[in-house]
């Protein structure tokens, strides 16, 4: 093979495959332009434009899902089109849309630049979508940086609030540190996959093909370990979770809601694709090949991480008196539950089982996004401008003064707990069943015990709302129309996904995941 031809091959440019991402990026630029020329009383237009852009991206994604019959890859394998990408894209669009609804009145009340915020949100959404569609480690990193840079700014968007500034700085410093781990891991894998005739590769499918003949196994192990650390930070797993409570508490509540659902799902999308498809289970050589040893190593590491993440998240959440910090530790615990499904996918012995486990993880993250955003929407209403009321005692007796808000928050908390007939219950059933199918009985028992532990702090807040009397004056807040719409959507989602999950699950399984041989 001609080396120059290999290095400088013309890329197979196919803009149709990245149409949703192009729409989101174009809307991000358009929102900035509109904001620059709009009158102060017309700044709400930027939120409407962003919602239209998300709707257009959703339509284009649906078209790709239902009617696209072209190539499943583009740009020389940098972008892929499969169930994993499209399923996560749907989650990202839902998360961003709900975040806009929650934030439209918030930016007005805080006297912040609505156009800047919504534009940053659009670019963060594009970054998440690129992470899910990445077929190459370089694309994973580019998508991650687009997402991270936008999110750093959003955390510090309340410029006059020292807590917001501290949140942004902590996230920036620790996020940069984790990105360095990820990038160095990519560099090591590139070097380890080089041969005498071919340069190294960062293409995920090509890495899997070269594993049996890898000449530098220690570099591969080191690279995989560093990427595990990088992804662990992004999805807030123990012991890489220490940034989460401070950042979530200090960031503006709509930003916290977005970060707890969107970037976490994006991290899982890339994490799944890289470790399941670059280091897959290969039956015939599982015990004596480089790929088999790497697979066994990361799977064992994930089991330990999942147990630590579920346990630490739930135990520390019990001691929290700030609702945002409590939900931050809850977010850590839910990352552990999602890892249970990830482990099941990694241990699957055939493609059908692997795809079923991947679907379980996607469904779980969808349910978590819906109920988590709903909970933060209520927290935002109660906290009011400046996030002044976020302590547990601020919720004393609101079940009598604002019964609708108390009912909504109670429903979301019960769903986060995993009560039957709610989305959270079906999400946990899916990931736990996938783990049981692979024989991880002890892991599932630990997950169920952690669910029981989480009942303490979820039910505690419900008890405070309905069985405690207020000791301070408090007037029931008005629910803005946009936030009311977000609450209606999330309540519908919690009930629909809990009562009729099969329809969503079947849709997620309609398009096969990127094929990797499991010979």
Map each language-model feature to its residues:
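Alpha-helical transmembrane segments of multi-pass membrane proteins predominantly involved
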Residues: 1-519
């Amino acid at each position: 093979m001609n080396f120059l031809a290999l290095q400088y091959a013309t890329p197979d440019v196919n803009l149709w495959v990245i149409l949703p991402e192009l729409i989101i990026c174009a809307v991000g630029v358009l929102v900035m332009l509109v904001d620059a020329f709009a009158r102060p009383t017309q700044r709400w237009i930027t939120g409407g434009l962003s919602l239209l852009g998300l709707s257009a991206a959703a339509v284009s994604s649906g078209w790709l899902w239902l009617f696209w019959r072209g190539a499943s890859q583009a740009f020389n394998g940098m972008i892929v089109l499969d169930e994993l990408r499209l399923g996560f894209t749907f989650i990202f669009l839902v998360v961003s849309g709900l975040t806009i609804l929650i934030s439209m009145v918030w930016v007005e009340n805080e006297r912040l630049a609505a156009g800047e915020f919504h534009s940053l949100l659009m670019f963060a959404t594009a970054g998440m979508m690129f992470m899910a569609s990445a077929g190459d480690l370089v694309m994973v990193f580019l998508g991650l940086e687009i997402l991270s840079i936008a999110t750093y700014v959003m955390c510090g968007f309340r410029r006059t609030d020292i807590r917001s500034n501290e949140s942004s700085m902590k996230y920036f410093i620790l996020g940069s540190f984790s990105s360095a781990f990820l990038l160095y891991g990519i560099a090591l894998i590139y070097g380890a996959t080089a041969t005498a005739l071919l340069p190294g590769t960062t293409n995920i499918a090509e890495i899997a093909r070269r594993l049996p003949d890898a000449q530098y196994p220690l570099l591969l192990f080191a690279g995989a370990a560093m990427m595990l650390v990088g992804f662990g930070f992004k999805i807030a797993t123990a012991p890489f979770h220490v940034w989460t409570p401070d950042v979530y508490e200090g960031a503006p509540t709509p930003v916290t809601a977005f970060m707890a659902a969107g970037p976490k799902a994006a991290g899982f999308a890339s994490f799944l694709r890289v470790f399941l498809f670059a280091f897959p289970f290969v039956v015939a050589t599982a015990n004596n090949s480089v790929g088999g040893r790497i697979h066994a190593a990361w799977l064992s590491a994930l089991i330990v991480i999942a147990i630590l993440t579920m346990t630490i998240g739930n135990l520390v959440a019990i001691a929290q008196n700030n609702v945002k910090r409590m939900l931050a530790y809850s977010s850590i615990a839910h990352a552990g539950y999602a890892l249970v499904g990830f482990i099941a996918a990694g241990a699957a012995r055939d493609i059908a089982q692997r795809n079923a486990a991947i679907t379980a993880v996607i469904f779980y993250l969808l349910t978590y996004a819906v109920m988590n955003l709903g909970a933060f929407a209520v927290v935002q209403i109660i906290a009011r401008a400046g996030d002044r009321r976020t302590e547990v005692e601020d919720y004393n007796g609101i079940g009598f003064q604002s019964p609708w808000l108390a009912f909504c928050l109670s429903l979301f908390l019960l769903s986060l707990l995993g009560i039957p007939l709610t989305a959270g219950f079906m999400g946990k059933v899916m990931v736990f069943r996938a783990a049981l199918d692979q024989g991880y009985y002890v892991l599932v028992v630990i997950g169920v015990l952690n669910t029981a532990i989480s009942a303490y702090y979820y039910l505690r807040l419900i008890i405070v709302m309905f069985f405690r009397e207020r000791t301070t004056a408090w007037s029931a807040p008005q629910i803005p129309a946009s936030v009311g719409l977000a609450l209606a959507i999330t309540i519908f989602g919690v009930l629909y996904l809990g009562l009729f999950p099969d329809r969503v699950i079947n849709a997620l399984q309609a398009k096969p995941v990127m094929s990797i041989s499991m010979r």
